[in-house]
Structure formats: structure tokens, C-alpha cells
Amino acid sequence: MKEPDDQDTDGEKSVTSKSDGKKSLRSSKSESRSPVQEDNTFLEDDTDETFTKGEGSYLEEDSDEERLEGSLSSFQYGDLQSTTVPQQTPAPAVEEAEEEVKKKISESFFYDYMELASMPFVTLDSNIPLDLLTLVHSFGYDCRKRANLQLLDDSIAIYIAGNQLIFLNLKTKEQIYLRSSSGEGIGVIGVHPHKTYFTVAEKGSFPDIIIYEYPSLRPYRVLRDGTEKGYAYVDFNYSGNLLASVGSNPDYTLTIWNWKEEQPILRTKAFSQEVFKVTFNPDKEEQLTTSGSGHIKFWEMAFTFTGLKLQGSLGRFGKTITTDIEGYMELPDGKVLSGSEWGNMLLWEGGLIKVELCRGTSKSCHNGPINQIMLYEGEVITVGSDGYVRIWDFETIDTADVIDETGLLEIEPINELQVDKNVNLFSMIKMNETGNNFWLAQDANGAIWKLDLSFSNITQDPECLFSFHSGAIEAVAVSPLTYLMATTALDCSVRIYDFASKTPLAQMKFKQGGTALVWVPRMVNFTGAQIIVGFEDGVVRILELYDPKGLTIFAGRKKILDADIQLKQVFKPHTACVTALAYERDGEILATGSKDQTVFFFEVERDYKPIGYINTPGPVCQLMWSPMSHPESTLLIICENGYILEAPLPTIKQEEDDHDVVSYEIKDMCIKCFHFSSVKSKILRLIEIEKRERQRELKEKIREERRNKLAAEMGEDGEKEFQEEEEEKEEEEEEEEPLPEIFIPSTPSPILCGFYSEPGKFWVSLGGYDSGFLYHCEFPPCDESSDFKEQKDEPIDVRYLADTEDNPIQTITFNINKVMMFCGMKNGAIRVYVLNQNDPSLTSLVDYWHFNMHDNNYGCIKSIANSFDDRFLVTAGADGNIFVFNIFSEFMLRKDMKAKVPSPRFGIETEPIPEDIEDPKAYSIENARRKREHDKLMKEVGEIKARKREQIKALRSEFCNLLEMNEKLPKHMQFKRTDFDVDSQIRAEMHRKTAFKIQQVEKELAWEKEKHELGLMKLKNRFRDPLESDTIVVHAILSDHKISSYRLVQPSKYSKFKRASQSERKPSKLDRFEKEGPGRKDSQRDAGGSVTIQEESIIEKGKKFRPKTLSEIIVENQIEKTRKLILKAERAQLKIQQRKKEWEELYKSKPGDDYEDPKDLQAIKEAQVYMGDFNLKTAPDYKIPEHMRINAAKKEEELGHLDSLVHGNKRHMNKCILSLRDLKVAVVEEIQCLVQELKNIQSTLHISKHIPIPKIPQIHPEEVPEKRFQYDEETLLNFKQQQMKSKDEKSPGVEQTGSGGPVGGFLKLSSRKDGDLTTRDSISRSSKASTFSLDIPKCLEFEKAEPTDVELEIMKRDEIKHVYMQQYLVNRIKELVVTFDAELRLLRHQKLKLDTQMKLSDLHHVTLFQEILLLKNFEKQENILQERVNSLDKEEQYMQWKINETLKEMEEKKNEITKLQEQEKALYAGFQAAIGENNKFANFLMKVLKKKIKRVKKKEVEGDADEDEESEESSEEESSLESDEDESESEDEVFDDSICPTNCDVALFELALHLREKRLDIEEALVEEKKIVDNLKKEYDTLSKKVKIVATNLNAAEEALEAYQREKQQRLNELLVVIPLKLHQIEYVVFGEIPSDLSGTLVFSNHALRRLQERIHELQEENSKQQKLNKEWRERRKQLIREKREMTKTIHKMEETVRQLMISKFGRVVNLEALQTLSVNTTLEELKIRKLRKELANAKEMKMWEEKIAQMRWELMMKTKEHTRKLYQMNDLCIEKKKLDSRLNTLQNQQGNAFQGPREADVVAREEVTELIQLQAERISALKEEIALLRRKGSLILPPIQSPREKEIQPADL
């Protein structure tokens, strides 16, 4: 065994962790999480390599809301590690948080493999070495595990085997092992895209993902807390910096990792059901896809406002049935192609199924699920469970779309490869072998294949590199002599291995799977060469192993293997699967157990003879004979349902006693039974009682010590204190919890295994509830009267097994000296107990060694065995793995160890191989005997029935004799037929029963009838309906000539669709570019401009519908008037410019004196190159013209055209032959009529004058093949009779005769019937002609007298007429026959010519097909080259267009510069003219004009006219303020241009300033235009360089394409083409004779030869034509020179006339262009319009303010009125107040005299008066405030103020 970082381990070291990887129950998470030990020097040396310790589980901290949210916040890029702060300077929490620093993992950091790898668990102080068992080799392969085959390089493959990762060298077949870290299994593995790392995703509680470096195999990174129980799939992205993982049940967590930093980026729940796979999109790494049970989901990593999220979109199946998706593939454009359970491909787009892809005739793409889909080199590869690898066209799939309501699209694969029969491909990986297309395939049926997918003529056949068992290993057995082992499984195979040399030797396949296996002991077969195997159909086979090298060697024999297996004997003792096999200790008896609840015994001799069987109360799971130490030989039978039986040796009967026995059942055997009753609850109860008793004793001891201590210290006081404390404790103590209840499971726990301990005693291991213990049981005495099912027995002793409550022992075996007990556990672990010698009670069952090897979930150990010398241990698990271990020994194993295969027995090659039992429904031994007895009984019953039938037959003959005697009697003495009926009702009942039976038979046969009708219809649809016309053979009448039609099949819809699709080819990218052209952008810009114009027009239309005011109408009229004037001037200027442009173009188009037409030059060049040259396709420098280049599509179109042409010709010929057949039928009918007439005529003539009647032609069956499918009842009856006659005949000749009988008979019958019909027709047709001949004999019948002379004359005349008619009819018949034969010969001649053409067409078809195959091989590379040429051509055209655009823009800019320069000159000229000649300030004004000043750049401000005006004014002010004075030409002169000099014209000064601004504008525009021109020149230079580079690349690409075309043409030239030639067509002769070798000849077509001959005449005609044209053009040139002279004179005259008219009208010569373009002053007109608008706006505003003043006056008047009303109210209130004051004074004076009442009334009155005074005071103050408000102007008038008292009084008053 090889492991990375393998180190010596100390055997005496105590290990406290189990193999599941938990280190002392993970007590220290910081230790388990920290990849390195805490070491100060480590931190000092590598500060980057720091990790966080004490980190908790990430999934435990997640809340349920975060999981349902669908995504989690991303982690920080590194772990946070809090730094400690000294206690002297405590800092606040904020500062502590800021001191946490992100730490990154160093790229050079690695973990220690020995710290990560799980180790065996050994009990403390047991002195058991850790390397008690050492893995030597693995012979198994978990082939049904997804993605369990990966490649690290060309020779190293890795796969999972339980808790090991195996590195398999494909060349040397060596294995290296890597242990899991958790010890609970490995979930899945993955490989980095660069093959530098691989990942191992484990299983267990919160398992890790460990990433190892390759090839060092050192642990590089550990990813934690990605799932709860295990990983289902992992995948790296294309760049390899991210890793995606998905968990298994129960959480199915999808996690995206930044694996180099060991941090999860995103996490969410993938789905609620099982997820099979997750992958990144290789083209868009932010997209992922997951698939699984009944779903597919599309994910995207998207940035949201809360951060990076995983957003998933579930695929909706719609009308398609929901399916599990195993394989899928992401397409480059985002679509996804997935498989399905029924084998079709589903194309997904936008989360929906776009189309379902199937094969032609609605066949599925694969027969079964598609397990993998890949995209490789532009082709789609699908891997199916049917064992096929199919290649599909990517373009067809990518552009697929629905064409009908079914949603299906039929496509066909390009290539396909069937690996082998019974192959279930699960996955494939590309092998990185340069120059080869080899793949490594995982076969779920137990193999690793090497596939060659190159699909060429040198493609290698699929090679099976390794073969394994598929599925669970059911049994394993080891040879008693050597290092050989045998295994069997449900994959129907038995395999032999040499585990010493680590080599598989032989295998043998069967129809059923093996379930039990035992190596025959030496006492039965001394050489140890026999194996006995039990199968699931109840068959037991004895196989013999031998070394074929010891056989006699024959010539021509295949490769001799190291071992071979041969079937020796086979028998079937059971009807269900055989579960156990056991040989008696002396080897005399074989016992077999089965699930059919029987145990069968065989006597072991030369052949195994059945003894008998016994019934068991349950399915048998194990058989074991007692060892030699027991006094008697007994069989221990263990049943699954809790029964254990002990059977003695059966009695062997003699053959003569056995002959008359009806059954093999043994009924008199004394069998002991033990029915296990659950005692685990009792054991747990006893344990709890003992635990409480120990606790009670401990408390009592502590109490006694306490009392003694207090008594010694304090005496009697201490005793009292102790009693008080005890009383308090007794009060505080609560009642004890109840003991565990006794529980017995309703379903008995299954018994897994057992073994003898002593005679009558045994140990058993149970599963289910009773697991966790090993039970020692004893059989009760044998009692035949008792019922097993009512029996309940308990074990006598138990042994506790640590950590087996949920993990029971599945199988047990011992070494030779019984000191080690090897246990195979349910979770795939191996446990070894070290025992004392002679310890049947297992008292030393304490110390053990425990190690997880097989898969913990489904890797239950099915069988475990040790070698004959206890040096090796073999385990076989349900996970398909077979491990071989070296048991700890002082002796080292030799590397050259090898097992010895037994030599073959003498005469083994001559022995006949026994007939195997392959039928699973075959009778067992017991059933065969019972069947034999039943057949014997049925034979006796048949003999009795036969005797009864003879008696009935005699009675029937006697009754028939009585009937005959009755018929011989006279009628009056005869009995009536009814008198013989004993009972009339019997006959009626018989008729009723007969009718009922007929009805019943019709009902019973209704299904058969419908079945046969459907079968006939399907046969017609399959074989008859596709035929367009069958073969018809028309025979000539007089000769043996015949002509046959073509058997035509209707053209398929696929071929029609294919031709249509080929004819409608897509345009190339270059064509599309040429169609679109470079002006597309301009058109888009124009379109955009039109849109804006359209929007503006819509706005203008909206304005038109509004009512216009008078001011708007005035302004619009003024604007329209100005616009018309400007438009007129612009039109004139445009016309002048257009005329100038036309003249410029005309002068530019004038060719130079040395100009030559490029077309002429090209034609001359081609003529010089190709003159007198006829290019051959075989020439090495042959250049294929563009129109003659071919590809596969063109060839397929040509092939389709050829097929349609051939089909049309054949169809036309078939129509002609069918017409000829109809002509023959018509001729035969007419001849039949004529023959009938001839017979009628000859009946009146004398026989001497008869002419031989011509034979009527017959219609052959070949001429009417359609009548073969017409039948009637008579035909069917004949067919039935012939079938009955030929029922027992087996010869092929007889079968052919019988099958052809009904057809031939039917055709004769049909022809006879047709003949009768035609005869009747002929009689009816010739009835009129033959009436006269029929009347004469009738007259002769009545008149016997001699005829008279007249009558004789009439008879003579009639005779002459009839003789003539006879000859005429005969000639007519001959004419018809000869004419028909002539027509047939003519048509036959045409048919022969057509046959020749059809043969040539077939040859041409073969040639075209060969060319298509060749062209398809070239098509891929040619498309790549053509695409490159197209792209470069497109790029060159685009750049050329860009250059042209740049040149055009440069020309425009140069024109703009010229115009600006002309404007500047015009400006100076105009200013000079305005100054005049003798102006003394001319120099000053010119300096002002030419002065250079700095200006602020004007900003474009959008707004109305006022804002524009303000901006212009401000810019002028700023420019005048910020302008600096420059030095003039004279440095001494300094002048101020801001002040106009005295005596200088102010208008000229202002004009100078104004023109200076214009000059500056022009200069700025010139600078900008020159900059643009410079930039355009640079761009032009850059583009020119790029064009040259692109042109160079284009030329190189075209040359490469041309070279590839030549290579393709050369390969096409190598194809052999058949051309039939006649001798006169061969003109290649040597010395007057045709040479024998014609390889150097050239086949030249007549068409090409005629074309060359015609070309001579064409060139002669062209020459004469060109001479004639030359002469005409010379004459034309002379004429043009004369016209030019005349036109020059006319121009001079017209110029003089124009000059004179200008002088007469203007007084001088003026510039007409300036006159025509004279326009209005736009600035002045704009100012006028703005002024008008401003006046109108001011008037409108004045009107608005006047209306507002009137409104305010009205409001002032209303306020004044209100104020006056308030003053009147205040006056009234003052008067009232005065009155009240006076009245109050009067009441106060009369207070003492007025009232003499009680004191209480005075108090109330006083209070009321006080309240009234307060109220009035409040009212007065309120009125004062209101008066003050009313006196102010513009104050807010409030409603009258009321006091609170008034508010209370008013409702009362109301």
C-alpha cells in the first residue's frame, strides 16, 4: 500500500479517536479547525500564514430566514483574528473592532496529511498495533457512483473506493491510496481545469472539502461547513479560481467557494429534492446550472442592492413529462441542452423547453437516460445508458426550433459508436493524448473503457481496460490451498482473483446473479479447484478452476490465459435465491439454504446426489456445521426472522428405496429450535438498576464518613447536627425516576450472523432494535409436538459491543487459532477483537481494532474471509469494493508472491460440458419429482379415458347399423328419425350449446382477430405502403421476351426536407455585409434625424390647432417674409454651388493623356496568362474558380437532384410498362371475344373447313402482382389445409412450396374467374353477330325435309361469308398479338437503354457519396478558413470605407477652410472699401481690426431670444474687459483701441470693432478646422497602415484557403470514377495500338471539346468586331474635335454679349454670383422681430396690471364699508355700557333696603353679578381689539370675538 507522506507509526501509541475522524468527540474545535499547530516561531517566520482559531460552524449560525432567502451575504476575503489588548491600556470596543486584521493564506502553505487522514481506533491499553491490517489492493470499483472516474494526466486515473481515494496507473496498473479525513466516506471528487489540483468532498457530520496538489498529493486547502451530511457534486469554473459544491440529503446546499482563501462566497438551497450535478457555464462564469430528481435549475451570480446574490430560475417542463436529468450542457449563447429519462434531448431557453430533439420516425436519441452531454470541437457528444456514444451537429441543435404542435424536432447523429452489448455508460473523460481522440468511459455495469471517437478508417475498437463487479458483492471465498479468491454478485458473474500478485485471473458469466459462494474444501476436492455457487433463481452450480497452460496445445488456438473456469455440474434445489452453502465437516454432505424457507441436503460423491430437504420457519440467511471439537455433526440454520435451528445429519437412503418416494421432504428428522425473544429492554433495565444501586452505595458511604467525622469532632452535638442534616436531605430528595419499561418490538429483529460456541450453544448478532450486543443462546431439548411459532426463548448470556447500537455486526469470521475475531460492520467498517485461546464464552471480548474502509452509507460488508495461512484478509461490501489486507505479522510479504492455479484434471478437455439450466422458470429437484408423479397419474387417467372412448365408438357403430336396417325396411314400417331420440330436449340442448360455444369462440378469438388485423395493417404500413410501385413483369405472347418494371419506394419526407433546406442556404456573413453596406450607420443616423423631424412636425401641428392672437399673426407674417427672402438667396447660392460642383466633377472625370482602362488592362493580363492554356484539375498549380468550388452541401444537393432525376425516369418507365400491361389485358379480352365469335362461326361450318383456333394468351401472375394481396374465403381455406399438411415438415424446400401454394392457387382461381367474366362479355358482345348462326340449327331441328335450291344457294352464300369471317377473325387475332409484341419489344429496347443509364447513375451515385464523405471531412477546416477570409475581407472593406469617409471629410474640411479664408479676405476687402482711400485714420483702424486679443470662449446657452441677447452682450463685455493689448508691428507705437480718437468717424470705429470680432471668429474656426484636418490625417495614416496589414493577412488567408482547396481537389481526384468508353472514343494509341496501361490518359468531354472549337470562331468574330469598332471610334473622335472648335467660338461670342449687357445695365462688370446671393440683413431682421415680440408682450403685461389694479380698488371699497359698519356697532355698544353703569350704581345704592331675605340668596346674587361684570369686561376688551384692527389698513378681518361665557349662553338662549 502506498500513501502520500507515509510515515512510521508507533505501535505503542494510544489512540483516542475513531476512524470516523472525530478527535475525542471534536472536543477542541480550534484544534480541528486550525491547519497548523500553535507555534510562535511559525508566526514569526511566515506572518502571512495565519488562520482563525475557535471558529464555530457556519451552518449552525445560519438562521432559517437566511436559508429561505435564497442567498447569503458573502464572506470576507480572509478570516478575522482578534488581537489581544494589554490590560494596562484598555481600549473601547470600537477600537478593538478596528484592530481586527484580515489575514490571507500564503500560496506556499500546505497542511500535514497525517494530521488530516483518519486513523484506526484502538481501545486504550490494549497493545493492539495501529497497522494490524494494512491495505494491499482493491479489486472493486463503485461503478454506479456519479462522476467516480477522473483523470489527472494521461496515465493516472482516480476513483473513490469507500473511505479511500485510489490513484490507478493505467499503464502499470499500480494503485496508490489516499485516506478520507472524516472516516465517514467520500462523497465526490473533482479535478482542477489545469490538472494541478484535485478536490475530495467527503461525507459525515459537516464534512470538509480537501483540495490536494498534484502530483505531490499534499493537502493544499480545506473548505469547511459547506453542507450537513455529505457532498453530491463539485465543479471548478473554467478559470479555476472558484469552486461550486452541492450537498446531499437533507439540506442540498449550493455553495460557491473562493477555495484558495477557504471562504464561501455565496450559499443557498439548491432544491428540495436530490441534486445530481452542478456546473459552471464555461463561457459565462457567473452562470451555473444544477439538475437532479425531477428538475433542472439555472443560476446566476448577480449584484443586487444588498450585495452579491445567487438567483435561481427553475426550469418549467410545460407539456413535457417531468423527468430526472442526469446529463446536460451549457451552450455558448446561454441555452442549455439536457437529457431525459426516455432518451430524448431537451433544449432549454429562458427557463422553458424550446424544443425536444429526437431521431427520425420519432425514435429517441438514446434507448434510456442520457447520462452525459458534452461539447467538443464544435460537436455535441451524448453518452447514453444504452451503451451508445452519439455525435450530433452543434449548429443544428443550436438553431433548432419547434415546427409543429408536438414540440419535437427530428435530427440524425453525425456518427455513433456502440461500445458493447450490456454496457451502461455513466460518464466520459477526454484523455490528453496529443494527436488522438481517446476517451475514458465509466461503465455502470462494471468496467472502464478506452474509446476512440475519431471515426476514421483507422479508428480503434473500444478497449475494456478494467472489468469489475457491478453493484453489491454478495459473497467471497478463499482457496484452502493458495492465494486465490472467488467472488460473485448480482451482475451474473463469478470472478477469480490472485490477491497475492494483485491480478484478476478469470470470470464466467451466467443468466442470473450469484448470491452465495463457497470454495469446496480439500476433503472433497484435494486440488482445491472447485467452487460451488448459488444463484438467485435457486440454481447451484459447481465450477472447476484450472490452468489452461496444462492442456494440450492445438494449432490456431487463441491466447492462453493464466486461469479458466469450466462448468462441472448444475442442479436446482430451490425456487428462490440461494443464500447459504455449507459442507459437512467430513465433506460427505452439502447443505444449501434459500429464501424459499428450505434447506436441501446432497450426498457428496463424484456427482452430487439429492438426499432431501427440510422446511424452516423463515428465510435462511446462514448455514454452519458444527466443528470437529463437537461430538456430533449438526447443522446450525439461522433464519432472518429470529429462528435458529439445529438439524442432525440426514440419513442417506439407497437408490432402490428412493425410487418410489413421491417427495424429497424429510419429515422424521429431530430438529431443535430456538425462537429468539428480545431481551435488550431487560438488559437496559438491569443496567439502570445496577447504576442506581452503585449511586446509592456511594451516597451511603459518603454519609457514613460524614457522620463519623462529625461525631469525632463535636461528639453528641455533631450527632444531632448530622441527624438534622439527614432529615433536611430526606425532605429535599425527590422521588426516583421510574425504571425503563420492558419493550418487545412488534417486528422481530433480523438475525445477521452467528456461530457455534459449544455443543448446543451458539452466539448470534442481531440488527434492528436488538443491536448493540452479542447474544449467547442454548437450544432447548427437541420436542416434535411443540410449535416453533409459539416458542419463545431468551439468551443465556450477552456481551456488550461498543458503538454498535446503530451499526451492528453483519458478518463474523475467525482466524485459524481463534484468537482474532474479524467482524464486518453494517457501515462498512472492519472490527477486529483480540480473544484469548479456548474462550467460547467470549469473556475476553473487550479490546478491539476498528477502521472504516467501505462506504459508510451503503457499503455494508457482505462477506469477510481470511486466507489459508492467516496472512491476508478479504472483505467484500455492498458498495462493490473488494479490499485485500495484510494481517499484522513479523514476516514481510514478498513482492513476487503469486498464487498457484490448480492444474487441469486428466481428460478435462474431452469431458462433455453439462447442459446448463438457463430458464429461471425451470423445475427444481422437488418440483421435477412432483411433476413426474403428476405426469404418471395423468397418464393413467388418459388410459381410462381412451377405454371409455372405445366403448362409445362401439355404441355409435351399433347405432349406425340400426339406422341402415331401418332405411331398408318399407316406408310404412320405418321409424321416424325423431323416434330414435331418447329425449328431444337433449338434441335441442345440443344445438343450443353448439350455438353458445360458437358465440363463445367468437368472443374468445375477438382479441386474436383484432391482433391479427392490426398485425396485417402494420405489415402493410411497413412493407406495402412505402412502395410507390411493385415489380411488374409483362410477357410477350408469341416470343419469350419480357419486360419488368422498377420496384420504386416513395421518396421520404426527410430527403425532401433536406433538399429544400439545402436549396435555401443561409447567406454568408460577407454577403450580408455587402447587402447592408457601410452606409448602414448613415441610414440609421438619417432615420434618427427623420424621427426628430417627425417629432418636431408633430409639435408644430399641435401648435397650429391653437387659436392665434393678432400679435402672433403679425410676428409670423414678418418671419415668413424674412424666411422667403433668405430662402430665395440660399437657393440661388445652392444652384451656383451645384453648378460649380458639376464642373469640378466633369473636369475630374476627364482622363489623362496616358490613361488606360483598368478593365482592358485586366483583360489583357488574363489573356496573356491564360491564352492557349486549358487548366486541368490534376495540375499542381490549378486554381479553382469561385463558382466551381464545391462543398458537402452542394454535393448533397447534386445527389438529391440525381436521386429525383433517377426516380422520375423510373417512374415514367413504370407508367409505360403499366400501360403496356393494361394493353395486354385489353388484347386478351378482345381475343377472348374474337375466339368466342370464331367458335360460333365454326359451329355452322363443316369440320373440314375449320381453321385451328388460336390459343388465348394467359395473364401471368407476375403481370398482376397486386392480386397477391386479394383473398376470399376459399383462398383462406386452401391456405389452412396446406398449413395443416406441412405442419410437421421442417425442410426449407417444403416450406417454400407450402408458402407459395395459396398464392399460386389463388392466381389460377382469379384467372379462371376473370376468364369466365371475359367469356361472358365476349358472348354478349358477339350475340348480335351470331344470331343468324344460332337460328339455322334451330330450324334444322324441326325441319327434316331436303332443302330447296334457294335454300342451298343461301347456305352456300352463308358458308362463303363464314369462311371469310373465320379467316378475318384469325388474322385479327394475329394482328393484335403481333402489334402487342412489337410494342413490347420497342419498350424493352427503351428499357435496356434506361437500364444502362440507371447503372451509370448508380455509379455516379456512389461517386457522389464518396465525394460527400470526403468533403465532410474537409468541411470543418474549410469553414474555419473561409470564415477567416470573410472576416478579414469584411474588415478590409470596413476600413476602406472608413478611409473613404475620412478622405471625404478631409475634403469637406479643406473646403470649409477655403471658404473661411475667402471670408477673411472679403472682410478685409470690405473694410478697406468702407475706409476709403484718403482716410488719415486708415492705419489706426486697420491696426484695430488686425489686433490680436485673447477672448473667453463663448458658451452655448439654450434659451429664448432675450437670454441669447443677454448672453451675447455679456460675452462682448467680457471680451472687451478681458482682452489684452498685444504688441503691434511697430514696438514704439502703443495705442488704446477702447477709445475712439478725436475726429475719427465713430461708425467706422464701431465697424472695425465689429469686424474684428468676426475676424477672430473666423480665425478660431480656421484653427479648429485645421486641428480636425490634422486629426483626420493621423486617422487616415493609421487606417492606411491597418489596411495594409489586413490586406497582407487577407492574402495569406486566401492563399491558405486556396491551398486547402487544392488539397481537397487532389483528394477528390484520387477517387476512382467509372467511365464507359467505346474504342472509337480512345485516341491515345502507341504505335497504332491501344496501350494496356491507360493511367496516363486524359478523359476529355465532348462538351468541353465543342466549347473549345466554338471558341475559335467566337474569337475570330470578336477580332473583326473590334476592328470595326476601332474604325467607328476614330471617326467619332474626328467629329468631336470639330464640334469642340465650334463650341469654343460660340462661348467667346456669348461672353462678349454678357459683358456688354452688364455695362449697359450696371455701368460696369459685376459679379453675378454675389448679386444673385444678395440677401437681407438677418441680424437686423431678427432684431426687428424681437422688438415686435417685446412690444406685444409689454402691452399684454400692461393690460394684466390694469386689471389687477381695478380688482384691488374693488377690494378696498368693500373693506371700507365693512370698517364703517364696525364703527357703528362700537358706538351702540358704548351707549349700552353707559346705561348699564348707571343702572349698576343705582342698584348698589339701594342694596340694603331692597332685599331682607336670607343670607344664601345674597351670596348667589353677588356671584351672578360678579360673573356678569367679568363677562362685560372681557367683551369690552375684545371690542377694543377689534376697533384697533379696523383702524389699520389691509388688516385681516376676523369674525366677531365671543367670550367663553357667551358661547355657553347662546345655545341656552336658542
Swiss-Prot record:
Keyword entries, A-Z: Cell projection, Cilium, Coiled coil, Cytoplasm, Cytoskeleton, Flagellum, Phosphoprotein, Repeat, WD repeat
A GO cellular component entry from the record: motile cilium
Disordered: annotated span: 1-98, 708-743, 1057-1093, 1282-1322, 1500-1538
Compartment(s): Cell projection, Cilium, Flagellum; Cytoplasm, Cytoskeleton, Flagellum axoneme
Polar residues compositional bias, start-end: 71-88
Entries under Pfam families matching the protein: Beta-prop_EML, WD40
Biased composition (Acidic residues): 58-67, 714-739, 1503-1536
Start-end of Basic and acidic residues biased regions: 1-32, 1061-1085, 1311-1322
Ranges: WD repeats: 226-267, 270-309, 315-358, 365-402, 468-507, 513-553, 573-612, 804-843, 856-895
Disease tied to this entry: Spermatogenic failure 20: An infertility disorder caused by spermatogenesis defects and characterized by abnormally shaped spermatozoa in the semen of affected individuals. SPGF20 patients have spermatozoa with absent, short, coiled, bent, and/or irregular-caliber flagella, which impair sperm motility.
Protein name: Cilia- and flagella-associated protein 44
The organism's taxonomic lineage, starting at the top: Eukaryota, Metazoa, Chordata, Craniata, Vertebrata
